[in-house]
A protein has these predicted regions:
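FAD-dependent oxidoreductase catalytic-site/capping-region signature
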Residues: 1-131, 136-138, 142-143, 149, ...
Length: 171
């Protein structure tokens, strides 16, 4: 029954090293977006470790059945059988459920328009009167539960912007 169902999520941080570059979003010739996320050996190892850690935790907590995130896999009733299967299981594109949590990055801050989208005050470099104030200003994900980091950055940027704004004349 649903009341006895549990799900876990393992976060793999990427974008910090050459062997774990993270994904890219680019535009096709017709203007639509395409996403590419390379399945590197480093990512595979992280997914395998995460799957094993989550299953071990679930079995230790009394789970009767645990199922891997890889498509087409059976339910397992014993930790040792699960561990053996995961260690042997290929982890390939379109066979492993991947998702994203705490999406951040994409609008890097900096002083050089060749390497940044926004200046150090969160202002978009290519359009006046547009500020970016959210997690997209981080270079990449900073890990789980980023709300305090985002709040702190946005509070600072918003206070700076508010101090610079001048009231519009009343008509």
């Amino acid at each position: 029954a649903l009341a006895n169902t549990n799900g876990l999520l393992a976060l793999c941080r990427d974008g910090f090293t050459e062997d774990s570059p993270g994904g890219t979003v680019s535009l096709r010739s017709d203007g639509t977006a395409t996403v590419d996320y390379p399945m590197t050996d480093t990512l595979r190892a992280g997914l395998r470790r995460g799957s094993l850690a989550m299953a071990e935790l679930q079995f230790a907590a009394g789970a009767k059945e645990v199922r891997p995130h890889q498509l087409g896999q059976p339910w397992f009733t014993r930790w040792d059988a699960y561990k053996q299967a995961i260690q042997a299981m290929p982890i390939e594109k379109f066979q492993t459920r991947l998702g994203s949590a705490h999406v951040m990055g994409g609008c890097a801050m900096g002083s050089d328009p060749a390497n940044a989208v926004a200046d150090n005050n969160g202002r978009y470099m290519n359009l006046d009167r547009l500020s970016i104030m959210d997690g997209s200003l981080f270079p990449t994900s900073i890990g789980a539960n980023p709300q305090l980091s985002i709040y702190g950055m946005v509070a600072r940027l918003a206070a700076m912007l508010a101090a610079e704004l001048k009231p519009l004349p009343v008509k």
